[in-house]
Amino acid sequence: MSFFDYISKDEITALITDLISIESHKDQPLFESAVAEYIQNRFKKEEIETELEQTCPDFPRPNVYAYLGGKSKSPELMLNGHIDTVPGFNMDYPAYTPFIRDGKIYGRGSADMKGGITGFMAAFIAAKRAGLVFRKSAMFAGVTGEEECSQGTEHLIKTGYEPVKVVISEPTEMSLCTAHKGFEWVEVTMIGRSCHGSKPWAGKNAIYAAARLCDLIQKELIPELESHPDPLLGPGTVCVGVVNGGHDPNIVPDRCTIQLDRRFMVTEPLETVYAQIISLAQRAADEYGCKFEWRPMDHSRPSMIALPHAIDPNDDYVQSTLKLLEEVTHKEQEPVVWPCGWTDAGLLGNYTKAKCIVVGPGEVACAHNNDEYCSLEQIYQASELYFKMLQTYCC
């Protein structure tokens, strides 16, 4: 019997429709609770062992777990995906009223990443209905808060889960991703001296110092990064995303803060990332007679550093999964990398011994967009792929 004898495409479509319909983001009073409970109840209906686990003492932020082959802290295969989305914002259509057009399902989270969650659920349901005999355990981990600071996966790691293999279903258009950059957000504050705007020579203008730092980043740091790109991922990047300073036009500003996003490679130690920024900040501050403070923006990323991820493309796990992917997509496959973006593989691949790959339905380019959508055919392919992975690695 084929995969779709155990779960139909119509049933898979109903799953993704339900998931999109349930708001699960940081602006919801109960955050991801409703979608976590939906997933848990759907697994319970299939008599699949499942549980909710709160990740935060102050707010209802549950991870939802399910197990085949018995509960284990060291599952042979973990299907990991985040159940939160970004908010609906000003979408081109009602964000949580999904509809289908030209083989695509539209709605917030369709690509990022409820399409992938649907594939995981469908694979687990089909495996249970097929009566597969599990020699090794498999785990579904629907994690919370990835769009903020990955507290769901961080909690999973801190509570002792050590999977052997992990697949993360971020939208890769059903290509198998083996590497991506890490990221760090850094805040630099220039500290000058205020005075009346009519005599600017009596003060130290912190905005000028911050502007000089931005200039140095553009003229020196960015070209330096671009001069030695990674052969697969390209160069590291830096983006100044926030500038905040001053009070009134007639006051020389004594403080100006910039916040920047730095994407870095496995070959770039975090200490080097910091040192580059500190060196330029010191030069800019000195030129304008200012001082400066800097800090990693810890509240904007996991307390575990958002490290780069890379697995050897020739690893047995990668190569065997590529063969399964070719069976499902009916075309030759090669490993790919994400030149931009980040996934929880940066945590699971660095803070555990797990081998991590990223493969899922949808286009990352339309994630968070006002017309977010996901290909239904890719969701069906993902569902079948994850089922085959359960068979191959656990049965």
Please identify what each model-predicted range represents.
Residues 1-4, 14, 54, 187-395:
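Metal-dependent amide/peptide-bond hydrolase catalytic core
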Residues 2-105, 129-134, 363:
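Acidic/His- and Gly-rich active-site-bordering loop/insert found
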Residues 19, 23, 43, 170, ...:
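Residue-level signal for inorganic ion chemistry
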Residues 51, 77-79, 141, 165-167, ...:
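Hydrophobic/aromatic beta-strand patches that form the interior of the parallel beta-sheet core
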Residues 65, 80, 139, 185-189, ...:
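Beta-strand secondary-structure signal
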Residues 87-101, 178-189, 323-324, 357:
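Acidic-glycine-rich active-site phosphate/pyrophosphate-binding loop
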Residues 104-119, 196:
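Glycine/serine-rich anion-binding loops at beta->alpha junctions
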Residues 113-185, 394-395:
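Acidic/histidine-rich catalytic neighborhood of metal-dependent amide-processing enzymes
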